Swiss-Prot record:
Subunit structure: Part of the RNA polymerase complex. Forms a stalk with Rpo4 that extends from the main structure.
Protein name: DNA-directed RNA polymerase subunit Rpo7
UniProt record, GO biological process: DNA-templated transcription initiation
Domain of life: Archaea
Organism: Methanocaldococcus jannaschii (strain ATCC 43067 / DSM 2661 / JAL-1 / JCM 10045 / NBRC 100440) (Methanococcus jannaschii)
Alphabetically ordered keywords of this record: Cytoplasm, DNA-directed RNA polymerase, Nucleotidyltransferase, Transcription, Transferase
EC number(s) reported in the record: 2.7.7.6
GO CC annotations, alphabetized: cytoplasm; DNA-directed RNA polymerase complex
SMART domains: S1 (SM00316)
GO molecular function: DNA binding; DNA-directed RNA polymerase activity
Reactions catalysed: RNA(n) + a ribonucleoside 5'-triphosphate = RNA(n+1) + diphosphate
Classification via SUPFAM superfamilies: N-terminal, heterodimerisation domain of RBP7 (RpoE), Nucleic acid-binding proteins
Function: DNA-dependent RNA polymerase (RNAP) catalyzes the transcription of DNA into RNA using the four ribonucleoside triphosphates as substrates.
Amino acid sequence: MYKILEIADVVKVPPEEFGKDLKETVKKILMEKYEGRLDKDVGFVLSIVDVKDIGEGKVVHGDGSAYHPVVFETLVYIPEMYELIEGEVVDVVEFGSFVRLGPLDGLIHVSQIMDDYVSYDPKREAIIGKETGKVLEIGDYVRARIVAISLKAERKRGSKIALTMRQPYLGKLEWIEEEKAKKQNQE
């Protein structure tokens, strides 16, 4: 889920930045420190939206930098359990498919792709339903539910998000439309 959070921190402004626009300098320092980082409690920081408040700076003996207490807004993405997501399939491998969820990728294990036995076609990089003939491949758009989350502090790479498409109205968007049309025809 995307959120705007208000965060308080202390920013170290080096002496070479004195005399420049303080708000712009603080925002630049915050962007370098936070943007693109993953925090288990906050989520994945996408952008520093605004610097709301900058307190009076204090100079520490022997340092020369000014330390300013600041309050700022940031745009974050934090995956939540049971959240419904839509995303693009960015990779298909023998054990499942990876779906882009904004700044992170989630894995749909082969057992969670569809209610059918499936096989992996390495030439097409696709997962194919044996009875239904349904195909899931790179570039397809899907709707899925988050069923497990393991975020590693500071590391996007070690984080894992597990997804399922084995619930009503989840799956490849084409499959969902076909299911809706079939139900309407039955009525």
